[in-house]
């Protein structure tokens, strides 16, 4: 150990001495090398600051180019993505357009092993069904879409177009006997939508004659256009001047419904129909509506019901006529069939024929046609045929009852005949009270004459108005008629008065009061306005009796008796046109 330590110490002692032993030449060489390195470093250090600026610029430009390329790359990616989507869409469109056409069929029933019985192309076929279609969910009569291989690939809706036929009867629950336009009978299946509907004979059905299916019940538009089902709101109290006629029709219509037990006890048959006849505008239609309203209320009270229900079938007479043979008769059958259905639960039903003479005129009187020869028997068979009319009342209205077929007017059909006459002075007062009510504004001067009593003022106004209308003075003279036997008679405006004319007079006076309020600012109705309205109303009617047949005009106007051959106007302040014979009268116009 001592020898080793001494050697290391000797080595340390000898190292510095060796460095100092280098020659000056060697040291000078090393100094030169170091000076060269220092000079080189100084040169590199001198040129280094000038080279960083271009590099920085290059770096900035490179970064900008990189950003621009990134943006372009993103835009290209979006464009390529959109182009790919468009290509896919175009491919789908091309594939869709390249597909073969699809056919349709009608589902009849489910077959074995997931097949379906389908009617397509005029044939009944058993077709395979796509797994996407559930056969159990298909309904009879439903439309199915078929591919080119006649495989059911989709369930569609039921058909909504086809032929309209009339139902004659339902056969065995899922089949029906229908009649077409040419009276061709056909048996069809009932589609699923009709299975839960209570069908009745006479219903209109939409059918597919090729597939043999009926799809839906079509509203009977021909009957809907002719029949207005309503519960009228007209009461007897709204009708003026017809107290006696109202009493007659109440005895004929209401008593059999309200006291049916007494009728059975006395073995008295209720009347089947009522004829209301008389001049136009005298309240025939109003009475018929009031009958329906009153009867409904009394029957409801008799049964202890709070709500009253009745049906008023208002038949538009002239629109019953149809150019096709048998169509008018069929419509009449449908109307009475509906009436029987409504009345089956004891609800009173009124079938109202307005202008009855236009449809049921005397057989054999037709000039250009003889439709009445079959229409009249159809009505007679409905009124007193095999099927009785329980709780159904037929009411007819006409101003030419002489033209209605006598078979309709005989007892047992239209049993009760009520004449609705033109109102006399007392009836006119009653009618005026329906339109001149205390709620109307009255002129202060007229009201002051009666001490502010509105009711007394209105009564006085009505009295003045009625006296002006019904006095037989020269200013109220209207016509001079000459009968076939040579007798002459002067007719006054009062002879042609009606409830409609009274309403028109009141309306004229009210309009005059409104115009006076606008001009003067004073509100209220005056008696002078009523008198002026009478003059205007008479002046408008003076030229109306100008029909070529005065005798026909007299029948409509309510003047019966000897045949009229001449008519001469006697209106004051107007030159007379002279007498007019039947064969010389011209310029036919409205009936008064």
UniProtKB/Swiss-Prot annotation:
One of its GO terms (molecular function) is ATP hydrolysis activity. Pathway: Protein degradation; proteasomal Pup-dependent pathway. Residues 25-99 form a coiled coil. Keywords: ATP-binding, Chaperone, Coiled coil, Nucleotide-binding, Proteasome. One of its GO terms (cellular component) is proteasome complex. Residues 1-24 are annotated as: Disordered. GO terms for biological process: modification-dependent protein catabolic process; proteasomal protein catabolic process. Residues 591-592 are annotated as: Docks into pockets in the proteasome alpha-ring. Consists of three main regions, an N-terminal coiled-coil domain that binds to protein Pup and functions as a docking station, an interdomain involved in ARC hexamerization, and a C-terminal ATPase domain of the AAA type. This is Proteasome-associated ATPase. It comes from Nakamurella multipartita (strain ATCC 700099 / DSM 44233 / CIP 104796 / JCM 9543 / NBRC 105858 / Y-104) (Microsphaera multipartita).
């Amino acid at each position: 150990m001592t020898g080793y330590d001494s050697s290391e110490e000797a080595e340390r002692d000898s190292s510095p001495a060796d460095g100092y032993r280098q020659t000056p030449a060697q040291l000078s060489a090393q100094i030169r090398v170091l000076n060269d390195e220092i000079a080189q470093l100084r040169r590199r250090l001198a040129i280094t600051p000038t080279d960083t600026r271009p590099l920085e610029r290059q770096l900035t430009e490179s970064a900008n180019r990189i950003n621009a390329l990134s943006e372009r790359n993103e835009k290209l990616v979006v464009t390529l993505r959109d182009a790919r989507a468009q290509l896919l869409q175009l491919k789908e469109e091309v594939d869709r357009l390249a597909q073969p056409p699809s056919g349709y069929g009608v589902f009849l029933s489910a077959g074995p092993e997931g097949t379906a019985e389908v009617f397509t192309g005029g044939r009944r076929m058993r077709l395979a069904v796509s797994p996407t279609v559930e056969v159990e969910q298909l309904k009879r009569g439903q439309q199915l879409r078929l591919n080119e291989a006649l495989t059911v690939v989709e369930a569609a809706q039921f058909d909504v177009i086809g032929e309209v036929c009339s139902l004659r009867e339902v056969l065995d629950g899922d089949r029906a006997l229908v009649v077409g336009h040419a009276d061709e009978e056909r048996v069809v299946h009932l589609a699923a939508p009709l299975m839960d509907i209570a069908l009745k004979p006479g219903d209109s059905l939409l059918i597919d004659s090729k597939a043999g299916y009926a799809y839906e019940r079509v509203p009977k538009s021909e009957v809907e256009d002719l029949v207005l089902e309503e519960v009228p709101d007209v009461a007897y109290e709204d009708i003026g001047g017809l107290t006696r006629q109202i009493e007659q029709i109440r005895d004929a219509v209401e008593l059999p419904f309200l006291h049916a037990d007494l009728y059975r006890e006395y073995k008295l048959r209720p009347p089947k129909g009522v004829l209301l006849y008389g001049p136009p505008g005298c309240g025939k239609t109003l009475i018929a509506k009031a009958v329906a309203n009153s009867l409904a209320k009394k029957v409801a009270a008799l049964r202890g019901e709070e709500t009253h229900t009745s049906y008023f079938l208002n038949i538009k007479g002239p629109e019953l006529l149809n150019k096709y043979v048998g169509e008018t008769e069929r419509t009449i059958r449908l109307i009475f069939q509906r009436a029987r259905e409504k009345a089956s639960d004891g609800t009173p039903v009124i079938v109202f024929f307005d202008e009855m003479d236009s449809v049921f005129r005397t057989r054999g009187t037709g000039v250009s046609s003889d439709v009445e020869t079959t229409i009249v028997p159809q009505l007679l068979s409905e009124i007193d045929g095999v099927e009785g009319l329980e709780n159904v009342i037929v009411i007819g209205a006409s101003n030419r009852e002489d033209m209605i077929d006598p078979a309709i007017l005989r007892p047992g059909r239209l049993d009760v005949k009520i004449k609705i006459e033109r109102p006399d002075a007392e009836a006119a007062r009653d009618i005026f009270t329906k339109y001149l009510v205390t709620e109307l504004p009255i002129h202060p001067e007229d009201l002051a004459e009666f001490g502010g009593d509105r009711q007394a003022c209105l009564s006085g106004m009505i009295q003045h108005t009625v006296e002006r209308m019904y006095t037989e003075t020269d200013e109220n003279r209207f016509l001079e008629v000459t009968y076939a036997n040579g007798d002459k008679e002067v007719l006054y405006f009062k002879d042609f008065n009606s409830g409609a004319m009274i309403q028109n007079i009141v309306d004229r006076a009210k309009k005059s009061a409104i115009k006076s309020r606008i001009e003067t600012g004073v509100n209220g109705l005056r008696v002078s306005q009523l008198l002026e309205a009478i003059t205007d109303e008479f002046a408008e009617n003076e030229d109306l009796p100008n029909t070529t047949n005065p005798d026909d005009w007299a029948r409509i106007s309510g003047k019966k008796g000897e045949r009229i051959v001449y008519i001469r106007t006697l209106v004051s302040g107007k030159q007379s046109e002279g007498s007019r014979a039947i064969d010389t009268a011209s310029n036919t116009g409205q009936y008064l």
